[in-house]
């Protein structure tokens, strides 16, 4: 049998039906003629490339084994640059992942078989390269450790989603425990000592980076929230799995919080650090955090989008051979760290099984349809117009309110919905408690008119 790593591009393992390899006409690939979803499988180990059809106009290229490996990311990047340099007619765009590359193309301009031959040839050249290196900026970002916005998100999660989660009330304590670190200071030291390499952008939106420390001994691992948070402050910094992410916008989320930083996205594009693009970071940037107070971060976040806060950005190069040499030199320490970390991770999961936290099931159910107490003369009820959970009660019986004042805040469909006082008056009764389920039409507050 022919060795895939030495075969010529036109003879690589392919499941496409036989036909002219370089036809200038559009090629029709019949689904029923395909023997497997994989239409190309070449190379071995970290030089393996698998191609799958992804719809009618996309080709998904997967590199190596499904594991976190910087070598795979660098080779994927090199393949993307090689295909970009060819400026192929019919290729619309290229989208890189951590160990993948998706090719969006027009099959009527570039037949699939021809595209596969080109990909295989370029992959050969990438794998043969002896000195693979990329530009790698070092971007110094301020980090407000355990920022109040992160604490608020945890508080809200405990009130409306899951109060007994293993990562509550402190994500940092959870990170310490699941990584077998001696104290919270060591968690902080690890995060600030790490150099987080940006492996991908747009995780999940607005230029948010997915990054991991270059030194494996800085790779803190965590599980994600289950269920997910319904609210996360913009630019919160969290760890999920072995990846660090900066949330590009306010929204739901699941990564474990360490703090908050400045904006990753600037729609106005008028700040020098963004270099004319709306997203701040680039592939293979190295993020290095430095500590600031919560108040300092408020000022930085105010000034940065206006061009009044200058980032410290250094320019460097990341060389694959040098990085592999570093891993070899530090192999013993890296192996010991991973063994200790894995033991702590497994012990944490065993504790969840023992105490019943491993199989979480929401018990919030539906608010009981109890009979409402009748209103007295001069009273007015304030009813919920939507089903959800009660997040906050802003008033207490006896409080005087004016029309338009917020009485309670509901959470429904990952949105905060305030219920407002319809009249000037005095609060007579609050019939719900934070964290309780509320049905549509349920009476929540009773007011008496002035």
Regions found by a protein language model. Give the residues of each.
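Conserved "landmark" site that anchors the functional core of diverse proteins
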Residues: 1-4, 24-368
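Short, low-complexity intrinsically disordered segments enriched in A/P/G/S/L with frequent Arg
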Residues: 11, 15-26, 44
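Exposed loop and linker-edge segments at protein-protein interfaces
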Residues: 394, 400, 429-432, 437
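Short hydrophobic beta/alpha edge segments that flank linear recognition/processing sites
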Residues: 399-420, 439-450
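Loop/turn positions that initiate beta-strands
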Residues: 1, 284-286, 398, 404, ...
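Acidic, low-complexity mobile loops and tails
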Residues: 365-408, 418, 424
């Amino acid at each position: 049998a022919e060795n895939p790593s030495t075969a010529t591009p036109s003879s690589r393992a392919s499941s496409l039906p036989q036909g002219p390899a370089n036809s200038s006409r559009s090629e029709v690939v019949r689904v029923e003629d395909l023997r497997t979803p994989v239409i190309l499988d070449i190379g071995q180990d970290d030089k393996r490339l698998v191609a799958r059809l992804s719809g009618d106009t996309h080709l998904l290229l997967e590199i190596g084994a499904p594991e976190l490996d910087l070598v795979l990311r660098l080779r994927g990047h090199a393949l993307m640059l090689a295909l970009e340099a060819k400026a192929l007619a019919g290729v619309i765009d290229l989208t890189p992942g951590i160990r993948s590359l998706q090719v969006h193309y027009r099959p009527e301009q570039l037949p699939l078989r021809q595209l596969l031959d080109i990909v295989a040839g370029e992959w050969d050249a990438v794998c043969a390269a002896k000195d693979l290196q990329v530009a790698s900026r070092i971007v110094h970002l301020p980090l407000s450790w355990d920022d109040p916005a992160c604490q608020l998100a945890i508080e809200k999660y405990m009130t409306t989603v899951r109060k007994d989660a293993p990562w509550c009330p402190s994500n940092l304590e959870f990170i310490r425990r699941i990584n077998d670190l001696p104290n919270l200071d060591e968690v902080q030291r690890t995060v600030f000592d790490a150099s987080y390499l940006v492996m991908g952008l747009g995780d999940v939106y607005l230029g948010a980076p997915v990054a991991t420390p270059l030194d494996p001994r800085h790779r803190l691992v965590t599980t994600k929230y289950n269920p997910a948070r319904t609210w996360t402050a913009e630019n919160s910094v969290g760890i999920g799995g072995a990846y660090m992410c900066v949330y590009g916008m306010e929204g739901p989320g699941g990564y474990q919080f360490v703090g908050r930083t400045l904006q990753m996205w600037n729609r106005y594009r008028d700040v020098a650090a963004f270099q004319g693009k709306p997203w701040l970071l680039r592939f293979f940037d190295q993020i290095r955090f430095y500590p600031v107070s919560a108040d300092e971060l408020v000022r930085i976040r105010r000034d940065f989008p206006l061009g009044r806060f200058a980032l410290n950005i250094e320019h460097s190069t990341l060389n694959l051979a040098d990085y592999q040499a570093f891993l070899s030199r530090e192999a013993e320490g890296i192996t010991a760290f991973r063994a200790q970390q894995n033991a702590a991770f497994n012990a944490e999961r065993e504790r969840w099984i023992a105490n019943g936290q491993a199989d979480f099931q929401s018990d919030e159910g539906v608010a009981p349809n109890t009979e409402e107490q009748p209103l007295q003369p001069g009273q007015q009820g304030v009813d919920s117009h939507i089903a959800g959970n009660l997040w906050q009660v802003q008033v207490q019986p006896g409080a005087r309110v004016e029309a338009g004042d917020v009485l309670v805040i509901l959470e429904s469909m990952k949105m905060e919905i305030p219920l407002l006082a319809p009249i000037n008056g005095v609060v007579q009764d609050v019939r719900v408690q934070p964290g309780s389920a509320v049905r549509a039409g349920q009476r929540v507050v009773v007011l008496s008119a002035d």
